[in-house]
Swiss-Prot record:
Protein family: In the N-terminal section; belongs to the carbohydrate kinase PfkB family.
Chain positions recorded as ATP binding sites: N194, L195, S196, E197
One matching Pfam family: PfkB
The encoding gene: hldE
Pathway the protein acts in: Nucleotide-sugar biosynthesis; ADP-L-glycero-beta-D-manno-heptose biosynthesis; ADP-L-glycero-beta-D-manno-heptose from D-glycero-beta-D-manno-heptose 7-phosphate: step 1/4; Nucleotide-sugar biosynthesis; ADP-L-glycero-beta-D-manno-heptose biosynthesis; ADP-L-glycero-beta-D-manno-heptose from D-glycero-beta-D-manno-heptose 7-phosphate: step 3/4
Reactions this protein catalyses: D-glycero-beta-D-manno-heptose 7-phosphate + ATP = D-glycero-beta-D-manno-heptose 1,7-bisphosphate + ADP + H(+); D-glycero-beta-D-manno-heptose 1-phosphate + ATP + H(+) = ADP-D-glycero-beta-D-manno-heptose + diphosphate
GO molecular function, one term: phosphotransferase activity, alcohol group as acceptor
Protein name: Bifunctional protein HldE
Location of region: Ribokinase: 1-318
Length: 474
């Protein structure tokens, strides 16, 4: 399956569910307490992160999608911290604050990135998250996906009202389920239990065949649009009526902390579906995102640049021959990491030592080098009959194999001016003995503040001379 980056900015999502604050006390441990056989942690830093449904909304916003959140909190300092964090991340949060009841807080005591202890501050809420004076229809206005983030803490008490209201508007409903009664999610477009949650409902599964069979029965009984079972190191299994099961292997390179991985899955799914992606593609993106987030410490969000880079790596486009869409994604990701983009162009028909030296010098002008080459018809117009000697595919393959070159792209026009307008490199480099103002595209690059540099050519290195020498020897 070919992966691509969705248009998350056009994908508004509403999250309703159990809001909590994940609080971390970071410190170091160097001795045992004289009072009891326990380590003493000297706290050096206190960190707050949105958790539960708030983490789902945060993940959606981090991908660039408009995110709204409805939940219940106490009327306390923890709720203030949550509100400030979410506002800073661009999440529109609507909290019902309950006096004399604490916001749910999960406090983790950390020593050198190892969790020593977790302390929970919570009382189940008896109040409906939607007792805000707002109507369900108003909340769903303009929304493309509804997420029910259920941690069984009492904020979600009206599953069916929400599901039916969304279905009436044609809005998909995604639910991250909890508890032993999945009937409350009847009619949802997709539910995303982990394996233990799934088996608590359907019974143990000896193998994938049994998982698929029991999953199909569950979908039928609950009128579900689809079922995604997350299976840890075994990846994910997507089940849909009248479709074969889709098994996706785990993508994690290194598992550091699984906290919040389920939130990342459902948030990526929601944002991708809201952006118009088909379910299998959305699941593949969620699988990729989960593989990234488990490599982070604690409750964490995945950013759009991180997902882009993972897609590029998956599609083999982190380096090499790219189309324009892939190149623009790669450039955006590089810029997100403060990398300087260098651009050069040419025919590069027969690659020689002069080319290699020139490209190494060009790469030294920044962090990433794009080489744009004329396609075959363009070379023929410029160089005359009998050229190019090598086809555009072969020329790009050779260039992509050079250590100095990050990305190679072809263009059909006589000049790369259209590419320059799209890519907007930080530096345009050309080899030759002419002035900067004579470089094709210099005016385009200088207009937006980019730099133009001319590098000298290596003497006695010429493709035309090589071609003539070969012809004379025949």
């Amino acid at each position: 399956m070919k992966l691509s980056m969705p248009r998350f900015d056009q994908a508004p999502v509403l999250v309703v569910g159990d809001v909590m604050l994940d609080r971390y006390w970071h410190g170091g441990t160097s001795r045992i307490s004289p009072e009891a056989p326990v380590p003493v942690v000297k706290v050096e830093q206190i960190e707050d992160r949105p958790g539960g449904a708030a983490n789902v909304a945060l993940n959606i916003a981090a991908l660039g999608a408009p995110a709204s959140l409805v939940g219940v909190t106490g009327d306390d300092e923890a709720a203030d911290s949550l509100s400030n964090s979410l506002k800073g991340a661009g999440v529109r949060a609507l909290f019902q604050r309950i006096a004399h009841q604490p916001t749910i807080v999960k406090l983790r005591v950390m020593s050198r990135h190892q969790q020593l202890l977790r302390i929970d501050f919570e009382e189940p809420f008896a109040t409906d998250a939607l007792a805000l004076g707002a109507q369900v229809d108003d909340l769903l206005e303009g929304i493309k996906v509804l997420v029910l983030s259920d941690y069984g803490k009492g904020a979600l008490k009206n599953h069916q009202a929400l599901i039916q209201a969304a279905r009436a508007k044609g809005i998909p409903v995604l639910a991250d389920p909890k508890g032993k009664d999945f009937s409350i999610y009847r009619g949802a477009s997709l539910i995303t239990p982990n394996l233990s949650e799934f088996e608590a409902i359907v019974g143990g599964c000896a193998d994938e065949h049994e998982l698929v069979t029991k999953g199909a029965t569950l979908m039928h009984d609950l009128d579900l649009g689809a079922l995604l079972v997350t299976r840890g190191e075994h990846g994910m299994t997507l089940l849909r009526p009248d479709h074969p099961a889709l098994h996706l292997p785990a993508r994690a390179r290194e598992v550091f902390d699984v906290t919040g991985a389920g939130d990342t899955v459902i948030s990526t799914l929601a944002a991708a579906i809201a952006a118009g992606e088909e379910l299998p593609h959305a699941v593949a993106l969620a699988n990729l995102a989960a593989g990234i987030v488990v490599g982070k410490l604690g409750t964490a969000a995945i950013s759009a640049p991180e997902l882009r880079r993972a897609i590029q790596r998956e599609e083999g486009s982190e380096r090499g021959v790219l189309g324009l869409e892939q190149l623009l994604l790669a450039v955006a990701d590089a810029r997100a990491h403060n990398e300087k983009i260098v651009f050069t162009n040419g025919c590069f028909d027969i690659l020689h030592a002069g080319h290699v030296t020139y490209l190494e010098q060009a790469r030294a002008q920044g962090d990433r080098l794009i080489v744009a080459i004329n396609d075959d018809a363009s070379v023929s117009r410029l160089k005359g009959p009998g050229r190019p000697i090598n086809s555009v595919d072969r020329r790009m393959a050779v260039l992509a194999g050079l250590g100095a070159v990050d990305w190679v792209i072809s263009f059909a026009e006589g000049t790369p001016e259209n590419l320059l307008r799209e890519v907007k490199p930080d530096v345009l480099v050309k080899g030759g003995d002419y002035g900067i103002d004579q470089v094709v595209g210099a005016d385009i690059v200088k207009a937006y503040g980019g730099a133009v540099k001319v590098l000298g050519l290596v003497e006695n290195s010429s493709t035309t001379a090589i071609v003539e020498k070969i012809r004379k020897s025949e």
